[in-house]
Amino acid sequence: MDIIIENRKVRFNYFIIQEFDAGIVLIGSEVKSLRQRKVSIAESYVTERNMELWLCNLHISEYTQANTKNHNPTRPRKLLLKKKQIYKISGNMKNDGFTVVPLFLYFNDKGIAKAKIVIVKGKKLHDKRETIKARDWNREKNRILRGG
């Protein structure tokens, strides 16, 4: 598994409820831009239209060697999942406080672009502070155990 890009803010800003692996419908120039890692997922999210899941605001830069028929960098991209997974995700999206966002994009062993999407619930400010305290304590604990 070759990770292209990771959205690190997801783990800090949200509680992760459940994870899913989804295929992404892409065109050729988008795949080439992904291989060059010219992508941003900071503002991206998942929406549901007609019982299909779409990845919105995923910015894949235009491929420089492509001809004039290059892709739109922020177009919605369809996610490929099993029907049971789509029902589960869309059901959770309708609940208050739940959101679906991509955690990271990667190429699997066969070279196919995939997205790890997660169902999340937003953290409050005090939850974020507890996360920072736990992370700092783990660093300090490891430093003490190493003897330095």
Swiss-Prot record:
Localization of this protein: Cytoplasm
Pfam (any one): SmpB
InterPro entries: SmpB (IPR023620), SsrA-bd_prot (IPR000037), SsrA-bd_prot_CS (IPR020081)
Chief place of localization: cytoplasm
Claim: Amino-acid biosynthesis is one of the keywords in the record: no
GO BP field: trans-translation
Matches recorded under NCBIfam families: PRK05422.1 (NF003843), smpB (TIGR00086)
Role summary: Required for rescue of stalled ribosomes mediated by trans-translation. Binds to transfer-messenger RNA (tmRNA), required for stable association of tmRNA with ribosomes. tmRNA and SmpB together mimic tRNA shape, replacing the anticodon stem-loop with SmpB. tmRNA is encoded by the ssrA gene; the 2 termini fold to resemble tRNA(Ala) and it encodes a 'tag peptide', a short internal open reading frame. During trans-translation Ala-aminoacylated tmRNA acts like a tRNA, entering the A-site of stalled ribosomes, displacing the stalled mRNA.
Similarity remark: Belongs to the SmpB family.
Protein name per Swiss-Prot or TrEMBL: SsrA-binding protein
Gene: smpB
